[in-house]
């Protein structure tokens, strides 16, 4: 396949040729077909609860639901995603793990697009604020044996675990999980600075949606947000949907962590991508999606999750946080690829010999979203805007 456009990395007008699952060559051309048509590494979203009406946390989740979730995000330029399971009874988590594994086993492209599962609960704080929208009745202490049962149901596909380090035996779980090859994250926590430091020493490497899943009011200092910002061993995932973090906080967190240690995530729910309206959801109950993609509890101003794809986060990083398009895409492709170890397979970059996971889109700095034209997964055009594929 031949694709022309400007490389997000350096703005060069190029023709990219793919051969099977790899990029065969990249040649400079006199000028791109359009100065606003960009070629980037495929977008990678490590926190996705659902999208387009497809819910990884639905009580009746099936392999088809997972497949449809992946396909709905191909249309938004996402070539890899981590289906994210929130706090639920063990039976529900096992069922979701089995559904995700079955979807991956049935289709190599789906497997390529799901590098791992992210378990965002249930080993989190039960306090209001840090717990977020997770159901209190299913929050429980860390249990390494239960974690093993999830992994068995997923046939080894579980890759990220978010945990509150103040819980009993949390640091032991972090240490054992890290030894097992999991990426351990701190999130939905009310931990003290000392407990944050202990978690980092035990092996935690990620802060899950830093600045959210937190108390509405915190001590000026010290607190668990400052402590996580200060640790160079922690990468921070951030929700840039325009509602979860104000622009000043977006800018400050990126500057504090540096571009090397930030990953953008959507944290999207199943109502993401749907028309504005009122919806009944498995998590959060009745919610209302506003025209500006703000998702709230019905009749309340309180957020009930996120409803924007990762592409909106990239646009907001440019419009609201002052990043360049190059930087914003890096936080949404190259950085998560490195965090998950996908860079070792040539993902997260556009160069000869790399994996042909590509997103082609149009964008100007005033746009509120990317306009995705082509999505390639392992060299296959899984979405083309003018054909409706995907």
Whereabouts are the PLM-identified features?
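Divalent metal-dependent hydrolysis catalytic cores, especially in the metallo-beta-lactamase
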Residues: 49-51, 55, 67-96, 113-125, ...
